[in-house]
Amino acid sequence: YDFSRIAEKHTTSGAIYFVIYKKHGTVVADTPFFSQVSEGISQGCKKNDYRLKISYIYEDEDTITKQIEEIQYSDCAGIILLGTEMEAGDLKPFLNLPIPVVLLDAYFETVPCNCVLINNVQGAYLAARHLIRSCKTQPGYLRSAYQISNFAERSSGFYKAIRASGMSSSRSIVHSLTPSMEGAYADMLEVIKNGEELASCYFADNDLIAVGAIKALKDSGYRIPQDIGIVGFDNLPLGSVIEPALTTIHVPKQYMGEAAAQKLIDLLNTPGQPPTKTEVSTMLVKRGTV
């Protein structure tokens, strides 16, 4: 038996680093979303006999360069970079590295790089269209008070559906809420307490905002969905256990992670490819909040 074949299979040099970039940590928290993405990356690495190491980078000018250098002079063969909280300028030091980098969960028009992300525009469009068809009225928007590229794209998909239905973008009622359950709950209570005008249905930038807002509305005597309908985004496990269960946009999270790992391994095997952008489509999950 030719044992050299076994040896060959395991000679992948170095590890793949999943680098989680934390700017303010309000969006990249330890939610099931990110654990499922990590699971996908882990599966993708296993399939190709690469070891996976996870590294956190916290935004702080002085230490970023040092942190990136540490990765560069380690056993790192390539990086999957979680760009959820990043801005275009934050990418530069990573792209100067002599190893391949795949950006996950973000995309910037100004930076040519390989990236894998959610089709946010399509997801938000589906959500808004569902609200318009079901509620026969103009949906409001529960937007994140912290802006990241994902939310900007969701905003664009939401307004695209509004315009496609012949409605005016400027007429949608918008509330800015903290993108966490507790934060959105407190902010929405404030909106209600201040007597601000409420829409009869809303699209929320993510499930955490949706669930926090639903709790605030219910605690203030509103019935969901009879008085106010809501659609979230992410399809977190939490959405199926609240009452009523949350209508939301499903994102194939594990697949995103696997696709990013596969892309990085392709770049390691065949360097010099032109950068590509991979968008993973979403799906409307109809439950009880509309």
Give the location of each predicted region.
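Hinge/beta->alpha junction and helix N-cap segments in small-molecule ligand-binding domains
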Residues: 23-36, 54-63, 116-126, 142-163, ...
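Alpha-helical recognition/docking segments in bacterial nutrient-uptake
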Residues: 11-129, 192-197, 208
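Nucleotide donor/acceptor-binding cores
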Residues: 12-16, 128-132, 136-139, 200, ...
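Periplasmic-binding protein-like
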Residues: 76-82, 140-143, 174, 196-206, ...
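Flexible loop/turn connectors
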Residues: 185-290
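N-terminal helix-turn-helix DNA-binding module of bacterial transcription factors
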Residues: 1-12, 290
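Residue-level detector of anion-binding/catalytic polar loops
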Residues: 51, 100, 137, 168, ...
